[in-house]
Design a protein with these regions (language model features):
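N-proximal low-complexity "stem/linker" segments adjacent to membrane-targeting elements
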Residues: 1-32
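Short, acidic, metal-binding catalytic loop of nucleotide-sugar glycosyltransferases
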Residues: 31-40
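Flexible acidic/His/Gly-enriched loops in nucleotide-sugar-dependent glycosyltransferase catalytic domains
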Residues: 78, 108-182, 252-259
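Short aromatic/hydrophobic "clamp" motif used to bind/position activated sugar donors
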Residues: 94
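Conserved nucleotide-sugar donor-binding catalytic segment
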Residues: 150-243
Length: 317
């Protein structure tokens, strides 16, 4: 029988786990939740139409955990699955754990500490460790270098929202603990296959209070050949451009310091140079005012017609 747990100090936290064809990883992911030094008040797992036996493994791991519930559905995509799980959950805060990642043991305790010390926050993100397909921590390589670059830019310019556009130092939805009020206000995770995490972060900075705890590792992100972000780089680039255009539309000058000085110009120019998305950004900025809501805009921006058009521009003939 399901039983909501409320025995911990601080706010209630639900952990939601979207599962899709990760039978190799799901046991260790769930164990990282069960071994928390400050327990989750509930665990909601949804299998998103997997074709492997990951759901059976998850049920076995959670069998003796009355605060856990597991569901199955037809494949609906990560953003829909996360939204459904959050809708089922009851806590004040939500922590997402993708089924191939791990929480560090003190993640939830640390988030409760931060809320207690600094007051209510709408989103908390921490430091990120990197592991390989076999769960070995990595000290070098492409992903480690990417995270290092992202921190270097943030440390240099001190513009957290613009720095996310440059390189997403939060890395993944697994590194987000956020308030239910933020999720409600955002309209949930948007219909983006690759960048729903970045869009949600942009909204969090625009909407409320964000705590960055980057010097303490909160999660371990698994890098493997089946990471969704590796599927179709041309479509990834379209989604990134759309999210940046939306951030420029909604946040505008708040991406920069109040001074609008030479340092801001340098930071912004470096982001544009690094992303190399000027053609798409200019187009999206031109059409964005025609759409009443960002979900409607994203539906247009990620349509097959537009993706094909941009692909032809980038690779004519």
């Amino acid at each position: 029988m399901f039983k909501f747990l409320k025995k911990t100090e601080g706010p209630t936290i639900s952990v939601v786990v979207p599962l899709y064809n990760h039978s190799r990883y799901i046991a260790s992911a769930l164990e990282s939740v069960l071994e928390q030094t400050s327990s989750a008040d509930e665990i909601i797992l949804i299998d998103d139409g997997s074709t492997d036996n990951g759901f059976d493994i998850a049920q076995r791991v959670l069998a003796k955990t009355p605060r856990a519930r597991a569901f199955r559905q037809e494949n609906a995509g990560a953003h829909n699955t996360i939204n459904r799980a959050i809708g089922i959950s009851r806590s004040e805060y939500v922590a997402v754990l993708n089924s191939d990642d791990l929480f560090t043991r003190r993640k939830l305790e640390r988030c409760r500490e931060l809320i207690s010390q600094r007051g209510p926050a709408d989103l908390i993100a921490g430091g990120v460790g990197i592991m390989d397909d076999d769960g070995r921590k990595q000290r070098g390589g492409v992903a480690v270098d990417w995270l290092a670059r992202s921190r270097t830019f943030l440390d240099q310019f001190g513009l957290p929202q613009l720095s996310l556009i440059n390189e997403n130092y939060v890395a993944t939805t697994s590194n987000m603990v956020f308030s239910r009020r933020l999720w409600d206000a955002s309209g949930g995770f948007q219909p983006l296959r690759y960048c729903h995490d970045l869009d949600f972060l942009m909204f969090a900075f625009e909407f409320g209070s964000v705590i960055l705890d980057l010097d303490e590792e909160h999660i371990v992100y698994r890098v493997h050949e089946r990471n969704t972000i590796k599927e179709d780089l041309s479509r990834v680039r379209v989604e990134i451009a759309a999210v940046i255009a939306e951030a420029l539309h909604q946040s505008g000058p708040r991406l920069l310091s109040p001074a609008f000085n030479e340092r801001d110009v340098q930071a912004f120019a470096e982001v544009m140079k690094n992303k190399q998305l000027s053609d798409m950004l200019c187009f999206f900025q031109t059409v964005r005012p025609a759409f009443a809501a960002r979900g409607e805009f994203y539906g247009y921006a990620t349509s097959d017609m537009l993706s094909t058009a941009f692909r032809r521009i980038v690779s004519p003939g």
